[in-house]
Amino acid sequence: MNQNLLVTKRDGSTERINLDKIHRVLDWAAEGLHNVSISQVELRSHIQFYDGIKTSDIHETIIKAAADLISRDAPDYQYLAARLAIFHLRKKAYGQFEPPALYDHVVKMVEMGKYDNHLLEDYTEEEFKQMDTFIDHDRDMTFSYAAVKQLEGKYLVQNRVTGEIYESAQFLYILVAACLFSNYPRETRLQYVKRFYDAVSTFKISLPTPIMSGVRTPTRQFSSCVLIECGDSLDSINATSSAIVKYVSQRAGIGINAGRIRALGSPIRGGEAFHTGCIPFYKHFQTAVKSCSQGGVRGGAATLFYPMWHLEVESLLVLKNNRGVEGNRVRHMDYGVQINKLMYTRLLKGEDITLFSPSDVPGLYDAFFADQEEFERLYTKYEKDDSIRKQRVKAVELFSLMMQERASTGRIYIQNVDHCNTHSPFDPAIAPVRQSNLCLEIALPTKPLNDVNDENGEIALCTLSAFNLGAINNLDELEELAILAVRALDALLDYQDYPIPAAKRGAMGRRTLGIGVINFAYYLAKHGKRYSDGSANNLTHKTFEAIQYYLLKASNELAKEQGACPWFNETTYAKGILPIDTYKKDLDTIANEPLHYDWEALRESIKTHGLRNSTLSALMPSETSSQISNATNGIEPPRGYVSIKASKDGILRQVVPDYEHLHDAYELLWEMPGNDGYLQLVGIMQKFIDQSISANTNYDPSRFPSGKVPMQQLLKDLLTAYKFGVKTLYYQNTRDGAEDAQDDLVPSIQDDGCESGACKI
C-alpha cells in the first residue's frame, strides 16, 4: 500500500495518508465483536484508495468494505459497518465525534428552521440540561448497518437536496419524546420523556416513519393511514379525490371505499343520462393518488374497496392484471374485495351469487356492514324481484376468478366485512366499519364527504406504533410499554395538524390508535416454537391477551385522568363488551390456553370511566422500522436468514436476530408446508386485536403435483381464514424460484405498496 498517497481533509487541506489512524478507527469499531477481521476490511478498502482522495471518501470506502462482508457466517460485520457509519455520520453532522450539548443543538436547529420553535417555548434551558443527562449516545453503537442506512435515508433531519445531515439518532429519540409530552404537567413530564426515550432508544417500542422523521420539525402530519369513503354522487367523488391529493402530498397511505358507486348503465336523473359505471371514476382516483410523488421517486399508494356482489364485479376483479387494454384496466392501485358469510355459504352449497348495482337495491349496501340478518333478508328479497336489474353467477366461478387474480397479481386483498363488524370495537348499528386501509390492518368507521370541507363526513385516521416482542423478557414488561405507547400516541393526536375538517372531527371524536408488534418470528424462535405445527398457538394466545389487556388498561387509566374520548358511546366497549366476548368460537379448538388477566375488573372499570381511545391495536407490516430495531418484519416468518433490501445507498444486508444461537429454531417462510399453521396464529391474534391484521398467504407451486397451486387449495385457505375469524388478507406471495438463486441471500420482496412508510411502520 502506497504510504505516500495524499488525502484531502474536510477543510480542504492535504496531508499524507495515515494508515495507522485508519487502523485505530477500525480497532475501535471492532471491539467486542466476534469473527470479524480488520485486515480483511483494510485489504478490501486499500485497493480503492487513490492520490488526492477525500477523507470522507476513505471513510465511505471502509464502511462499504465492511458492509460487503456481512454474511450468515459473519453477522457481526453488520455492527462493525454500523459503528463506522455512525462515526462518519457524527463527523458530518457535528464536525466531530462527540455530540454537542442538547440545548445548544436545539437552539441552533430552531434558528436554522429545522426544528419546531415550540421546543424552546415549551422547555427551559434547565429542562434541556436535565434531558441531556437522560441521553446515552453509546446506544448509537447498538444499531445494525441496515438501521444506520435507514436512519440516514429516511429519519434524520437533513437537507434532502444537498444531503447534509443535522442530527444523530439519540437526539431524534429524546426530541420525539420531548415534543409528545410537552403538554404534560411540568412536574411529571420529564419523567415521561425519560421513560419514553429509554423505551424507543432500546428498541422496545418501534415508531412509524412519519413520527420518526417528522416530530420535532415544523411539519405536523403524522397519521400513517387515511381511510376515505366515497358516496354515489359527483360532488362526493370530487371531494374524495381532493381529499386523496391532500393526504398523498403528506406521505399518507390511502384506503378508498368506492363500493357505493352505481354500476354501468344505471339511470341518472331518472334516465336523462346513462351512467358510465365505476371504472372511469376509479381512474380518476388513481390519477389523484399518483399526482404527488414523494421526492420525485414515486406517487402515493392506495387500496380501493368494493363489495363482491357489485354488478360490475367481473370487470373490477381484472383491473390489475396485465391483459386487457388501457381503457379497461386501472393497474396502479390495489383492490380489496368485501365478502360476508352469505357469499361463502353460496360457495359451499354450490349456489349462485346475484350481482346488483348498489343504487338499485335500497338499504342493501348499508346492511352489508351494519346487520348481517337484515342483509340476507333484503338480498334474497331483491333476488326474487324481477323488476330489479341483476346478474346471476355461479359462486364457485366468481370466487375462482377472484382467487386467480389474487394469485396472479398478489395484490387483490380480502375483507370479511361481517367479522369486521361483529368482532369490532364499534357498534355496527351506529358506527359500522365499511372499509380498510392501504395495508389491510385498519378497520374504522367512515362517512362519505359531499365536499372537502363537509363537517358531516368522516375520514378515519390511524396512528401506529409497535412493541418489539424480541426485546422483552416477560409479558409483565408490556404494562409499562403500553402506558408509554398509548400516552405518546394519544398526545400526538392533539399535537398534529389536520388538513381536512372531516379528518379532525373523527380523530378528535374517536382518538383511534393502532399498536402492533414486530419481531414475532424471533420471539417464536427464542421460545423454540414454530409457525406451522401448532406449537406456538398457546404462547401466541398468552402474548396477545397480555398486549390487548395492558393497552386497554393504559387507555382506561388515561381516561380517568383526561376523560374518555368524546364518541366513546359509539363503541361496544361502552356496553361492557370486550374482544374476549365476540371472537370466533372455532378458535377454541386450536388454542386451549385459559385467560390469565382480570378481565372482569377491567370491564367494570371501562364501563365506569370509559377509554381514552376507541381502538388500541392493529398488526401492520413493518419493513422499514423493523430494520431500525434489527427485528423481523411484523408477524411474518423471514424469507431467509439474510435479507437483502435495495436502497439508494446500495444493497443492505440484514441477518435475522441472534442467528448464531437460533438458526435451527427459525422457521423460514418457504419451509412452511402450507398456510394452516400461520392462519391459525392470525386467528388467535385476531381474538384480541380490536382492529385488523395484515395477514399474507404464501404458496410454493413446486409443492404441488403439477407445479401449479390448485384452485381448491386457494379456496380452502380462504375458508380456513374465515373460519378462524380472520378479518382481512393482505398479500398473496408465490415462490418463483428466482429469489433463491443467491445461496442463502434471499432478497426480501420489493414492495411498493407502502413505500411512503405510510401505514406500515
UniProtKB/Swiss-Prot annotation:
A GO MF term: protein folding chaperone
Residues the record marks as active site: N437 (proton acceptor), C439 (cysteine radical intermediate), E441 (proton acceptor)
Cross-referenced Pfam families: ATP-cone, Ribonuc_red_lgC, Ribonuc_red_lgN
Binding site for dTTP: D232, S233, L234, R262, R269
Group of enzyme by EC: oxidoreductase
Note: E.coli produces two separate class I enzymes. This one is the functional enzyme during growth.
Residues the entry annotates as binding ATP: K9, E15, R16, I17, N18, L19, D20, K21, T55, K91
Site (Important for electron transfer): Y730, Y731
Family the entry assigns: Belongs to the ribonucleoside diphosphate reductase large chain family.
Outcome of substituting Y731F: Loss of activity
Site annotation Interacts with thioredoxin/glutaredoxin: residues: C754, C759
Record's keyword annotation contains Ligase: no
InterPro entries cross-referenced by the UniProt entry: ATP-cone_dom, NrdE_NrdA_C, RNR_lg_C, RNR_lsu_N, RNR_R1-su_N, Rrm1
Name of the featured protein: Ribonucleoside-diphosphate reductase 1 subunit alpha
Keyword Cytoplasm: no
Catalytic activity reported: a 2'-deoxyribonucleoside 5'-diphosphate + [thioredoxin]-disulfide + H2O = a ribonucleoside 5'-diphosphate + [thioredoxin]-dithiol
